[in-house]
Amino acid sequence: MLETHQAPDRAILLQALEPKVTRDACQRLLDELVHLSTTAGLEVHATQLLSLQKAVPATYFGSGQVEELARRIEEDEIDVAVVNHALTPIQQRNLEKKLNAKVVDRTGLILEIFAARARTREGIMQVELASLMYQQSRLVRSWTHLERQRGGVGLRGGPGERQIEVDRRLIRERIHKLKKQLEEVERTRALQRQPRQDIPLFTVALVGYTNAGKSTLFNLLTRAGVLAEDKLFATLDPTMRAVDLPDGGRILLSDTVGFIRQLPHQLVAAFKATLEEVMSADMLLHVVDLSDPEWERYVESVNGVLQELEVQHTRTLTVYNKIDRLESRGILERELARGDTIGVSAQTGEGVEPLLSELRRAVGRAMLRYEVILPVSDGRWLAKFHAEASVVEVREGEDFTTLIVELAPAVLGRLQGEVEREGVEVQFRPVD
């Protein structure tokens, strides 16, 4: 990955102008590539749209275009050419030779960002696995970057052709080892998650296109210092915090990695565990930047990924963010009329209270509310309810303490069974 102590590499960004795609659409793709490249730490020196009737098997772009690019790269002292397309290993290798510069395709660039953003041990291993699987057929790449603390695709290249056979063997061995380690991590996570599944906190996951404002909204709701900046993929590993709701009650809220259009399928599979909180959530908040002219396309992109994760049937509330940037509220009013939608500004706080109220109603529909009466002297069971239920209200009496709690049906049954077996003086009364 790019080293922070070095000056950023100067890059030229290349987008193919294909016959069936409008120039405006291609320009939007190029604009997105600018954001991706900046996030990866590159200095964007130039961007260029190149007409392409059909991809050339050897170099992707035509020979005349490649020659012109080579001259420009030499004159402008450009270090990296970023191609907004998935290149074959042969195309990438040939382009690097002809351009005399490092060539990175879309998949490699996204991997570079993931590598820089991974926080947990599991996230780092997932990045490394995805990078290695990407590199397997790119024989000029070296495995030496794997010795770094975080994996990446290595924008600065490797030691050369004589390493190819060694690379093949080392990469195969490392992939096998990583898969075994990740299987063990997944088993451990399943065991660690089991106690939390018994805690009746309603789980909500923030999802959305990159830069939709998820982390900013997460910070506002939780007052947590999660990395929130104007860069794509600002959160790679899910971060969870408890959020207090109006009228009592709590939820577990998770902030997750943003999705993008044309995310390579192999990356979705490699990062599936990173999105585990999405797959296990009781509810999704789909955060949409309504001020972006391309917001409808982004919604389609996110919905496509959710379908791949098989969570499209999870109850979803669409949160239209950045409404403070709208020139007219007409579009917001139209979308709010569809239902299961709400408008907010994570920047100004507008709409956050109604959002919390909506979450409160969702919790109320999913959880059971009970009045629990127990002796004041029974500190163990008092602590147990605080640990294993969402305590909405506490009323202290002379001899008894009364709790209003919310909990899942399975947890209620388990606690009632424990009370009966132990013969303790605890009463349960449903609250309408």
Swiss-Prot record:
UniProt keyword list: Cytoplasm, GTP-binding, Magnesium, Metal-binding, Nucleotide-binding
Chain residues that bind GTP: 208-215, 233-237, 255-258, 321-324, 345-347
Chief localisation class: cytoplasm
Compartment annotation: Cytoplasm
Co-factor(s): Mg(2+)
Span of domain Hflx-type G: 202-367
InterPro entries: G_HFLX_dom, GTP-bd, GTP-bd_M, GTPase_HflX, GTPase_HflX_N, GTPase_HflX_N_sf, P-loop_NTPase
GO terms, molecular function: GTP binding; GTPase activity; metal ion binding; ribosome binding
PROSITE patterns from the UniProt entry: G_HFLX
Functional note: GTPase that associates with the 50S ribosomal subunit and may have a role during protein synthesis or ribosome biogenesis.
Family that this chain belongs to: Belongs to the TRAFAC class OBG-HflX-like GTPase superfamily. HflX GTPase family.
Assembly and interaction partners: Monomer. Associates with the 50S ribosomal subunit.
Name of the protein: GTPase HflX
Source species: Magnetococcus marinus (strain ATCC BAA-1437 / JCM 17883 / MC-1)
Source organism phylogeny: Bacteria, Pseudomonadati, Pseudomonadota, Alphaproteobacteria, Magnetococcales
Gene transcribed to yield this protein: hflX
